[in-house]
Structures are given as C-alpha cells and as structure tokens.
Amino acid sequence: IKSRLKPGVEFIAVMKGDGYRHGIAGLYPTLKECGIDSYAVAIWEEGKMLRDAGATESILILGDTADDMLDEAAKYDLDLTVFSMEGAENMAAAARRAGKKQNVQIKLNTGMNRIGFPVCQESFDTIKKICEMDDLNVTGIFTHFARADEGDHTSARKQLDLYLHAVNELEKM
C-alpha cells in the first residue's frame, strides 16, 4: 500500500480497540517493519500501550481526551484531537505545565455527529485562533465519514465536499 502513495504522504495505521482486538503491543513490531509513519488510536491509554511497546513515531488520539488526562498525554508525547476552544485552552495549559508544545489535529464534523467543529464560519474563526496559540502545534485536520462503507457513496461524497470546502476556507485565512 505504501508504495502506491505519493512522496510526502504519510502512512498511518489506525489501532483503535487494542488494534481491533489483535493487541497493539503485538502488532507494533510488524507494522513498524511495514514502514508505518505514524499511528492513530481511540484513547490515550492505547497511545501509552504503543509507547510502552517501543513506538517512537507520532501517535494521534482520535477521540476526546479528558482534561484530567492531558498531562499524561503530554508525558507520553501523544498528539491530541481538538474540537473546541475550551479543549484547546486546556491542552495549551497542559503543554505549558509539561514545558513543551502540544501537537494537535483539528477534527471537523462533516456528518458523523460525535465530535468535531461544525463546518461554518464561526468554527473557522475559532480554528484560526487555535492555530495562533503559542503552546499548540497544529499538525493536521481530519474528519470521520459517516456511512462510508455503504454501497451508495452519495453521503460520503457530500461529506468529502464539505470537508474540502472547510479546508479551502481555512487555507484562505
């Protein structure tokens, strides 16, 4: 798969649910041999499991990280998902306590309706402010398509269009 990617495109292994019940620690050495560039997990404990298994690559927590776990996430050098100004401020405070910048990725809500900034001007303004925060390093932006596995891709296409619109608007700012 990686050989088919364009140069500069990262190959990310999603390891939610303890590696989809295969065991994160056991899968890590094999995935490393495959040339995985970074990892994504659902919760900070899974990120810790990867670090404990020897992972030095970037690890993104896809879900919400509770405020009382932000210091632990910083300790294990885990990238966080941000989807509110309040969350960003709490992440920045934890980064200051840790004495380092916190890597974060912006989550957009294009239809899954769990977490994420809605695609609207108010969100774009908030995201711009987050990008300007001294203690945060915004490394990316992502979404999670709802119903993407259905045979009819109409819904997924609408979500992709919404995501691309948001990225385009943010790049203008």
Language-model segments: what does each one mean?
Residues 4:
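Conserved PLP-enzyme active-site core in the AAT-like
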Residues 7-173:
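Active-site-proximal beta-alpha core segment in soluble small-molecule metabolic enzymes
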